[in-house]
From Swiss-Prot:
Its EC number is 2.7.4.22. Pathway: Pyrimidine metabolism; CTP biosynthesis via de novo pathway; UDP from UMP (UMPK route): step 1/1. GO terms for biological process: 'de novo' CTP biosynthetic process; UDP biosynthetic process. One of its GO terms (molecular function) is UMP kinase activity. GO terms for cellular component: cytoplasm. Inhibited by UTP. Pfam families: AA_kinase. This is Uridylate kinase. The lineage of its organism: Bacteria, Pseudomonadati, Thermodesulfobacteriota, Desulfovibrionia, Desulfovibrionales. Homohexamer.
Length: 238
């Protein structure tokens, strides 16, 4: 068994990732594939907290631009993340991994309320913790929620798993000559506006000196990252 570099990480997934080849909704086959990647690292003893976006169901920011009240749109987006969290919970538990969904918006018939100490106890017991409903406040993205939960739960790294292999100078899905950045500082990421995470999330990680690693959600990349291999892009340092 490979030795783990980290004991506890925060894994951020976009909602769009769950849609697979579709542009909308939840694709069960894709969710299962992602959960196999997560299960591989949990089997190694890694403690995993998850934050999942809701963009495959509802994106508050784009809808507010069409005239909807921003707060209402953001709350709808938060509820979308709960749907995604329940889908991932179901898939992980089918693989034999106890999983708890903790929501920043109370809905006691569906999931537990997010309480930091409770989340930490679940992690210590080897359960996967899915933090749903963002921060529970409008105007904050799920990127910011991921950074916040990562700090609260004392995670040693934030891993952002995406459809591409890391951070590029331009969109690699559209440009064959896109160049991958193996390493970036927090300040470089902010100045270049590379879209790794939003500025609030990056600043929070920078202030608390928690590295952000951007990698492919498949190809065994998450496992390679937690074992200490230099995969994708690592954002750290001044």
């Amino acid at each position: 068994m490979s030795e783990l570099k980290y004991k506890r990480v925060l894994l951020k997934l976009s909602g769009e990732a769950l849609a697979g080849e579709n542009k909308f909704g939840i694709d069960p086959a894709t969710v299962s594939k992602i959960c196999h990647e997560i299960a591989d690292v949990v089997d190694m003893g890694l403690q995993v907290a998850l934050v999942i976006g809701g963009g495959n169901i509802f994106r508050g920011l784009s809808s507010s631009a069409k005239g909807m009240d921003r707060s209402s749109a953001d709350y709808m987006g938060m509820l979308a993340t709960v749907l995604n969290a329940l889908a991932v919970q179901d898939a992980l538990e089918k693989l034999g991994h106890p999983t708890r969904v903790l929501s920043a918006i109370t809905m006691q018939e569906v999931c537990e309320p997010y309480i930091r100490r409770r989340a930490e106890r679940h992690l210590e017991k080897g359960r996967v913790v899915i933090c749903a409903a963002g921060t529970g406040n409008p105007y904050f993205t799920t990127d910011t929620a991921a950074a916040l939960r990562g700090m609260e739960l004392k995670c040693e790294a934030i891993i952002k798993a995406t459809k591409v292999d890391g951070v590029y100078d331009k969109d690699p899905m559209k440009h064959d000559d896109a160049v991958l950045f193996p390493r970036l500082t927090y300040v470089e990421t902010l100045q270049r506006k590379l879209g790794v995470m939003d500025s609030t999330a990056i600043t929070l990680a920078m202030e608390n000196e928690v590295p952000i690693i951007v990698c492919n959600m498949f190809k065994g990349s998450i496992k390679r990252v937690v074992c200490g291999e230099e995969v994708g892009t690592i954002v750290q340092g001044g």
